UniProtKB/Swiss-Prot annotation:
This is ASTRA-associated protein 1. Keywords: Chromatin regulator, Nucleus, Repeat, WD repeat. One of its GO terms (cellular component) is nucleus. It comes from the Eukaryota. Its main location: nucleus. One of its GO terms (biological process) is chromatin organization. It holds the Pfam family WD40. Component of the ASTRA complex involved in chromatin remodeling. The keyword Transmembrane does not apply. The gene is ASA1. SUPFAM superfamilies: WD40 repeat-like.
Length: 428
């Protein structure tokens, strides 16, 4: 793909009447959620819906495949649901597959829902997505938006493991939790104040997880944190123009004296916040090349910030790159960890190499982009060639603010390349 031109999607999925806010692949399926609370379950074989239902009263924040038949959804309505999704012998779900029109999008009475197996009240004040891996769920604490709660899925229900997770460091204010990720018994947290933290969640006998890493690496709120699938590293992006690569270590950051937290409390749903619309301005100049808490060649330390390295041993990122575009959200890594993808506030999707965070591709949605997702290809011994292709293809999904979902494919080779030039990752 030439950077001077736009790639052509291999498929365009139409159906949502509101901006797409969440996407998640699983095997030959894709699920998508929108700003009005609707969920679409798509087949990548037919590229048509298998089921459509109104899952939440407000925007979908998270979609998580817990296993091949259970889908977790989180909404801005402070609810988390677990649905059972099944197909019959003919590949039918028994649910509606007719997309709602814009005139009836808020009247879901004609759309039966899948079997709801579990419901939980959560704190969605932050717009923070939940994180899930191998039966563990991380989410913002129900009572304090600057803390994290860790739960475990056991016998068809979530049980609290820890409910008061935050960096216990003297004199710091992290702001609210913005994004979460779990990888290899490590909990990664991004904060409103620009900090990121890593906690060790392997020892259940402790009354709080060990803090392994803490650094303020952004001058704006952190929007995304994602762990590398094989390396002990993670990357973060924020409302500023930096993509920062961090280490994941087993060190212990000294914390102030801690008292054992109180047991988890079952409180009422937090009050709904007042939502203020902010006009998007793609012409914004990128912020100053400023990173707090560490030294990076070519970047200046923000005035007035005193770095106390003795409080944060080895809390220094591996790399930081100013990509000159503010507002990098929905950051994703492909299954091999070779590529980084972001959805920009300027409506552009950007692909970077992981190793040196160099830009390899830029393309955009006409009406703006809300979220992006990579698939994880699997091997297949099926006799159905269409199903085999859907399972083994490396998909990219781009959710637009116009309600459309664009599907692209990455051609897999020795170097994941196609064609000539710097940008060879997207099939035309």
């Amino acid at each position: 793909m030439d950077l001077s031109g736009a790639p052509v999607p291999v498929a365009l999925l139409r159906g949502h009447t509101h901006p797409v806010t969440s996407l998640r692949f699983y095997n030959a399926f894709l699920v998508s959620g929108d700003e009005s609370g609707w969920v679409f379950w798509w087949s990548l074989v037919t590229r048509r819906p298998l089921a459509i239902w109104k899952a939440h009263h407000e925007a979908i924040l998270s979609l998580v495949w817990m296993d091949e038949t259970h889908l977790l959804t989180q909404g801005r309505d402070d609810k988390l649901y677990v649905w059972r999704l099944e197909l019959d012998a003919q590949g039918k779900s028994g649910l509606s597959v007719k997309p709602p029109s814009s005139l009836v999008a808020d009247d879901p009475t004609d759309y039966p829902k899948p079997w709801l197996t579990y419901s939980l009240t959560v704190n969605s004040l932050n717009f923070c997505q939940v994180a899930w891996v191998n039966g563990l769920l991380a989410k913002p604490d129900l009572d304090s938006s600057d803390k994290v709660e860790l739960l475990e899925w056991t016998d068809g229900a979530f049980r609290v493991v820890w409910n008061d997770i935050y960096p216990r460091l003297n004199g710091i204010k992290t702001g609210i939790v913005m994004d979460l990720n779990i990888m290899n018994k490590k909990l990664i947290v991004g904060y409103e104040g620009g900090a990121v933290a890593v906690f060790d969640i392997s020892d259940r006998n402790r009354y709080t997880p060990v803090l392994n890493y803490y650094v303020v690496s952004h001058v704006q709120p952190v929007l995304s944190v994602r762990a590398h699938p094989t390396k002990k590293e993670f990357v973060s992006s924020s409302a500023d123009s930096l993509i920062v690569k961090h280490p994941i270590k087993d060190q212990v950051v000294p914390e102030e004296e801690m008292e054992e937290p109180e047991p988890a409390k079952n409180s009422e749903r937090p009050p709904s916040p007042k939502i203020v619309e902010v006009e998007d301005s793609p012409e914004l100049e990128p912020p100053k090349n400023v990173v707090r808490g560490f030294d990076v060649p070519g970047l200046e330390l923000e005035e007035g910030i005193e770095v106390k390295e003795e409080e944060k041993p080895e809390s220094k990122p591996l790399d930081a790159v100013n990509v000159r575009h503010s507002g990098l959200s929905s950051l994703q890594l492909d299954s091999d960890g070779d590529l980084i993808m972001t959805a920009g506030w300027d409506g552009k999707v950007r692909l970077f190499t992981y190793d040196d965070i160099s830009k390899v591709s830029v393309f955009h949605e006409r009406e703006g982009v809300g979220c992006v997702a990579f698939s994880t290809p699997t091997t297949s011994d099926t006799a159905n060639p269409r199903l085999a292709k859907a399972l083994t293809t490396r998909w990219i999904a781009v959710g637009g603010k116009d309600g459309k979902i664009e599907l692209y494919t990455i051609q897999q080779g020795n170097e994941k390349t196609l064609g000539e030039g710097r940008s060879k990752y997207i099939r035309h």
